[in-house]
Every structure is written in C-alpha cells, then in structure tokens.
Amino acid sequence: MSEPEELHHPDIHTTAGKLADLRRRVQEATHAGSARAVEKQHAKGKLTARERIELLIDEGSFVELDEFAQHRSTDFGMENNRPYGDGVVTGYGMVDGRPVAVFSQDFTVFGGALGEVFGQKIMKVMDFALKTGCPVIGINDSGGARIQEGVSALGMYGEIFRRNTHASGVIPQISLVVGPCAGGAVYSPAITDFTVMVDQTSHMFITGPDVIKTVTGEDVGFEELGGARTHNAVSGVAHHMAGDEKDAIEYVKQLLSYLPSNNLSEPPVFPEEADLALTDEDRELDVIVPDSANQPYDMHAVIEHILDDAEFFETQALFAPNILTGFGRVEGHPVGIVANQPMQFAGCLDIDASEKAARFVRTCDAFNVPVITFVDVPGFLPGVDQEHTGIIRRGAKLIYAYAEATVPLITVITRKAFGGAYDVMGSKHLGADLNLAWPTAQIAVMGAQGAVNILHRRTIAAAESAGDGDATRARLIQEYEDTLLNPYTAAERGYIDAVIMPSDTRSHVVRGLRQLRTKRESLPPKKHGNIPL
C-alpha cells in the first residue's frame, strides 16, 4: 500500500496505524476550511484564523486545545458536515515570552458562525485564562450566531458575556475585530478592555444596513454604519484603527507590553535609571506654553518630553481628540497618561472626553499602572446638546474614576484649570498623590473675562455710561489675573504640592514615581460602587 493510502486508510489496530490516524486527523483539523474558502478570505485581504495566531504567538509556543471538537447538531443536514474545530481555533502560548490565551474565529468554516461547541471552546479557554492569570485575546471574524443551532448558540453568547464580566479587571482582555461582528456578538468585544479594528475589513453593528432600512428607512452602508473609522472616531467603541491585520496584531503585542498578566501582578518593567541632569530637551518645556492664554500648543510635545525615548502609545487617538490617553514608560516602568489637548476645543471636557478618560483611568487602576495627568482645561464644553445628552451624569464618571483609583496618581497643571474641570482632572481633592503646577498655571473658578463680568457688573456698566468701558474692563481683568490666575493661591492651601519649572517636570515625575512605588491604599469594603452609568 502506498504512503498516501496509509494516511487516508491507516490500520488503526496497530500502533503505527494509530499514529498515522492521529496525523490524518490533525491534517484535517488544520485545514478545516475548504481551499476555495481560504482563497476567498485571502482575496479580501484577510488572513485565516491560524495565520493570525501564527503572527500573534511566539514561534513554536502555541498549544491548541479542543482541536478535534465537532458540533452535535443534526438539524438542516448539519450531521453531514462536521469539521474538526467547529470553526474556532483555541489555545495558549507566549507573546514576547509572556503567557496568553487566545481564540481565533475561522470564517472559512461555517462563516465563523457560533454554535454550541464553538461557544464551549471559547468558554473553556477563557476559564483557563482566568484560572492561570493570563491575558485572553479574542480574534473576531464571524457571521454571528449559527442559525441552525437556534437558542443553543444564543446561550453560548450569554455564557461568554458572563465570563467577560467576571474576568474584567482580573486579566487583560483584548478583542481583535478583523471581519464582521454583528448582533449579540458585538457585546463580548464591548466588555473587554481594548478593541482593535482593521480599516475597511472590520464591521461591528447590532442591526445591519438591510434591517435598518426596513425599519427606519435609513440608507446606510456597512462602512458608515459600523466600520473601523466609525467606531474609532464617532462611537468610541474601538481603541485603535489598524491599516491591515499585521498592523493590528502588532498593536496588540505592544499593548500587552504595558499590562500585567493579571491584577495581582505588576506590569512588565525594563529598568533604566533616569539621568536627572537638566538637558536642552528639558529646557524646551520652558517655552512651550504661549504668552497668550488663548493660543494653543500640542500637549503631545509635553508628554513626549516626560516619557522614556519620547514613546507615547496612544489609545483611542481618533475619538474625543480634546483629551489624550495612552501608555508610556518612565524609568522603564509603564505609566498611563491622561492629558487635555489645547489643540482641540481648547482642551474642554465634553461627554466623549469624560467617558474616554474615565474608562482609561479605571483600566490603569485595575491593572496597577500609575496615572500621570497633564491639565490645561478651561472647563466643560457648553451647549444645549451636551446638557441634554447627560454631561452631568456622564462627566461624573471621570470624577468617580479618579476618586476610586488607588494606583499612584501624579497631576501636572500646565496652564488652565478652571471651575469643576479643575476638580475633575486628577485634583488633590479627588485623591491624587502628587500635584504639581507650572508657573504658567491658572487655577481659578473661571477665566478673567467671565469673572470680571460677574464681579464688577455695576462698575463696568457705570464706566460704559461714562465712555470708559473698555479701559475699565481691561484694568479689572488685569487685577483679576494678577490676584487669582496663578498657581500660588492653590499652593498656599496645599492643593498644589509644588510649583516647578517646566524643565524640571521629568525630574519631579521620576522622583515622585520612585517614592510612590510602595504606595498602599484601600477603599471602604463594599460589594461594588454604583458608578453613574
């Protein structure tokens, strides 16, 4: 008998035959999708489930689980098509030498549709990740629930959501959406910590374009409704828009380098003692804030001066650009960054910015990553739409996030810190450990023009009647600025720990983080808080 025949029809009554039978089954499982389906996948610019795992996991480290799992459905002729793996590849391995668990949905098998066994495989690998304390990465490329299996498929979604919820804040959960993700399937990525999408090939929505047109009459395409750009720039559902799948996977690998394996571990550290001697680069910060309070500057430049190698790993870069969030390192230790961006809406806080920053602060707090906050905020964005859409309740999420955080918190006020926005942005009053201010800081209830209009309404009215309104207003504004628009009133009261030269910021941050590494703080015992959702 020829070798190929032995592979297809091994004598399973012998040891050699049993080994050959295993090899045959592994071969079938590895190529569960038809060649035509794989070809169509590649034609769309997409990788297969196993190709994605190969890119993500360190070479030779992947261990597959449930490779031979098969569905048990007998309806609609399903008993005649029972491929190994049931349309999802699950297992564990290493990313940059650190353990992770992973599941990768296979669109070449049943369109990646989730059935009972498919769901059980994902549940098992999630349970495995939670028990072993390692991150879980879900690669989503699925047509949704497997209709032939009915409520069994829906039940599996619910089981997965419950596991996502129980694992939240315990192990990092990252979702890669690299194809369709529709209906109930979208809620698993929504619960996870980070969601990465690929431009033009990823789509997430509860109801598709056809249903929307039937019900509401709205005519919308897949890309506009739930494409990567929509969820990165408009809805805020996603955290990064990748150019292709390789870029997406690279982003995930880099993201993992800032996160611990679980909430009981510390994030990965690459120790490198900082040279605290003043440099020309440090001195650049002394001239970064313009003389005019209304002139913007790029907060990215401030952040990059503080971080190792000026490397700022931004999250949700396209969403709520008036606030910046992301990771970096100081002396090799990961830190989270939250910063107002004067280049967008003058750095005002609005609903989107508040929720973006609140979620990021809570993620950092859950995974033991210190938070450094840079403040230049004139207040909350005024507008009827903001008020009616719930800025009070939704802005309060940022207060809640800072107030409940027990990780080291360092805040640097670079310029404006007005009104309630001053309190919200990591103030001493919410529990920040170290609050610094530049000499350019303006900490007050409001800006000079608005304050003078309220404080000196009668004086200004009388001056205007006498034809001296502009000069009087200018004099009163100058008096207000000299009296209150500075960091020293807050420093007198201990709300600011130190007023520092901008060029000394990195030095103060480095020393502060060194001291705060032994910080221990706990919250009052409770089942859980009631964040204003």
What are these regions (language model features)?
Residues 1-533:
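Ligand-binding clefts of soluble mixed alpha/beta catalytic domains
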